Design a protein with these regions (language model features):
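Elongated alpha-helical scaffolds that mediate protein-protein interactions in large eukaryotic proteins
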Residues: 1-118, 125-149, 163-170, 186-197, ...
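Eukaryotic scaffolding regions of large macromolecular assemblies
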Residues: 233-404
Length: 464
């Protein structure tokens, strides 16, 4: 390496590393990069330094990244390493085994967006499939402190409206820092409290810029939401940031706004991964919120009197859209998160849950979670309308009874009634065999009680 460094100028080194980064995007053409220390290479390259780097493998790259005085050379090497760690998981353990996580933690103390992005990304990738000691990095290398300080730097920048030109690396660096914090708090829960000071910074960053109409949860909003999920929201320091005394509903209103826009903007393929964390965060916020905030969340997320003008889940309000997705077959995690949130908003009371969303939406959740269906559930419930008047509600659909509309279908003929009775008989028998519920076929019950009379084929009903 010394000979190569002596014979190559800084620009030559950087050009070689840039070329290596391009080769490194395809593992098929760059196996030597992904080894710890390669002796020879068949790579056909003209640059002698490029050949030296390939021969030495990732060991040489780590030296360039961490033991050079040129920041430009170090960043070029870090980009190659980051690509290698992304494409070849075995290189992550090489990075850890050689003791570089501690050095990377030290490098997080920076005021350069490129450095923050690269070191955060490499540490983030090293949390997968390695024996990295995150606890030691937090205790001995100030990992949590550096992450929190970097988040604070993003707050101190001018807002969108004040910036003349946005630096794309600033946003990318923020995203990698948030992803790193999420993984560290996920894999090292014992040291979660070290990141509590980050809550106030994350809250501030929620207002750093406006979300887009097409993708309201694109970075930084999705990473900001995700990062809060693993933090201690019960801590006094967190409570002051999440429910400020002068406006306790401020944060939850922001998250509700993101949910309202996000659940409408994304296709079914993206709902599961993008929107589910927002719903999960609202559950955590509700769990730790003061009474005033809880009440506001209930008013925003539970069906209103206006929603009950029709069968619940058929309108365009946020509660209606949530109910629709609570039975979404293509997004199982989202539908479970929504049902749990609505159950929490119902004070985890099965009777209130049925009253709020209707038995049609509540039954599946109650059954899956072994929550007994309330025995006192009456055939009709009542709830307040927009003016506060109590009106009877269909317990299955959640709609006001006086708003129900029935189709003007002609009365069934005797033959149609017989076919329908036979169909119901078969369905009851199938249901009984499943063992899911203990039910008796009404025809069988009628026979046992002597209320069933078999008529002859020539029977004619006499009319008065």
């Amino acid at each position: 390496m010394a000979a190569a460094m002596g014979t190559a100028t800084g620009p030559d080194r950087n050009d070689a590393l840039e070329e290596l980064k391009i080769y490194g995007r395809d593992p098929k053409n760059a196996d030597p990069i992904f080894t710890a220390n390669v002796r020879r290479s068949t790579a056909s390259v003209s640059n002698s330094l490029y050949l030296t780097i390939v021969i030495k493998g990732i060991t040489m790259l780590l030296r360039y990244a961490f033991h050079t005085t040129s920041s430009e050379t170090a960043r070029a090497a870090l980009r190659v390493i980051a690509n290698a760690m992304l494409l070849k998981p075995e290189t992550r353990q090489m990075f850890v085994s050689k003791g570089y996580p501690a050095r990377a933690c030290e490098k997080l103390k920076t005021d350069n967006w490129d450095d923050e992005f690269l070191f955060s990304r490499i540490l983030f990738l090293s949390t997968y499939g390695t024996d990295i000691d995150l606890k030691a990095l937090i205790e001995d290398c100030q990992l949590a402190e550096h992450i929190v300080n970097n988040l604070e730097r993003h707050i101190n920048l001018p807002s969108d409206k004040q910036k003349q030109k946005l630096d794309p690396m600033e946003e990318m660096a923020l995203g990698e820092t948030l992803k790193l914090m999420f993984n560290v708090t996920h894999f090292c829960k014992a040291k979660m409290s070290a990141f509590t000071p980050a809550v106030s910074h994350i809250v501030s960053l929620l207002w750093k810029q406006d979300s887009s109409d097409a993708k309201p949860l694109e970075p930084p909003f999705s990473p900001l939401v995700n990062s809060l999920l693993n933090l201690d929201l019960q801590a006094d320091q967190s409570q002051l940031s999440l429910y400020p005394e002068n406006d306790p509903n401020k944060v939850t209103s922001r998250i509700l706004h993101l949910l309202d826009r996000g659940i409408r903007a994304y296709s079914e393929n993206d709902l599961e991964t993008v929107v589910t964390p927002v719903v999960s965060l609202l559950s955590k916020l509700y769990e730790n919120a003061p009474r005033e905030v809880r009440q506001r969340m209930k008013e925003s997320l539970l069906p209103t009197g206006e929603d009950r003008q029709a069968v619940l889940g058929r309108g365009d309000s946020l509660p209606s859209v949530l109910l629709k997705n609570s039975t979404n077959p293509t997004a199982p995690a989202l539908r479970d998160a929504i049902s749990h949130l609505l159950f929490d908003l119902s004070d985890k009371d099965a009777s209130k849950f049925v009253e709020n969303v209707g038995y049609g939406f509540a039954s599946g959740f109650l059954f899956q979670n072994n929550v007994p269906v309330p025995a006192s559930l009456s055939s009709s419930l009542s709830t307040g309308d927009a003016s506060g008047n109590q009106r009877p509600v269909n317990p299955i659909t959640g709609q006001f009874l006086d708003e129900q509309k029935f189709a003007n279908a002609p009365e069934m003929t005797e033959e149609e009634k017989e076919r329908e009775a036979e169909r119901l008989f078969v369905l009851f028998e199938r249901l009984k065999k499943t063992g899911v519920i203990n039910i008796q076929n009404p025809v069988e019950k009628a026979v046992q009680e002597g209320r069933f009379e078999e008529l002859s084929d020539d029977y004619v009903e006499e009319l008065d």
